[in-house]
């Protein structure tokens, strides 16, 4: 796929007009539009630059930036991460992807180890389902979803003095063994 005329965020921390070539869901080449003109002047055809059977998107007036990572969210679209079903986690991830977020680290609240374990179990099931769908590249469901890349354990290991919305009943000092048990789920 070729994305033409996009305003691309560069390593110089500014936007420049460029063409982006994508193969197998990976960016393989970014060509400043001036270079595209130089290729044309050098006698290179569109076929030399990208495959003809590849779709082309004109991104004139649009910006292309790296996918964003949401490192602290408690939910979205009416669903709370801690109480969501696996299907509701998918809805949260769909919403995030629709808004430019390609990866999420949802945050926990302060709960008992049992409840936190159930949260971890649902997150694991979502992650496995998401990974299998990506590997199969299923055409049945081509819905974009943010990848769950971790869990932000905001609670229960948080300061009682700065508890905010956390339930003080479950706030406790850091417990490495409890964390490991939750991590292994």
Residue ranges and their predicted role:
Residues 85-88, 119-122, 175-177:
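Charged helix-capping and loop-helix junction motifs
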Residues 124-185:
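Metal-coordinating catalytic core of metallo-dependent amide/deamination hydrolases
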Residues 81-82, 108, 168-171:
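Glycine- and other small-residue-rich loops at beta-strand/loop junctions that grip anionic moieties
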């Amino acid at each position: 796929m070729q994305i033409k005329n996009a305003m691309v965020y560069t390593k110089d921390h500014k936007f420049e007009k460029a063409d982006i070539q994508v193969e197998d869901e990976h960016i393989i080449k970014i060509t400043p539009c001036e270079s595209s003109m130089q290729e044309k002047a050098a006698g290179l055809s569109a076929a030399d630059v990208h495959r003809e059977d590849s779709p082309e998107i004109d991104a004139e007036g649009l910006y292309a930036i790296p996918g964003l990572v949401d490192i602290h969210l408690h939910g979205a679209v009416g669903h709370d991460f801690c109480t969501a079903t696996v299907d509701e986690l998918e809805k949260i991830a769909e919403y995030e992807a629709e808004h430019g977020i390609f990866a999420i680290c949802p945050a926990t609240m302060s709960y008992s180890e049992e409840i936190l374990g159930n949260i971890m179990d649902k997150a694991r099931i979502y992650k496995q389902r998401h990974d299998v769908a990506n590997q199969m590249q299923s055409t049945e469901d081509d819905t974009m979803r943010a990848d769950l890349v971790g869990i932000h354990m905001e609670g229960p290991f948080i300061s009682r003095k700065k508890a905010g919305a956390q339930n003080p009943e479950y706030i406790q000092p850091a417990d490495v063994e409890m964390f490991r048990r939750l991590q292994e789920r």
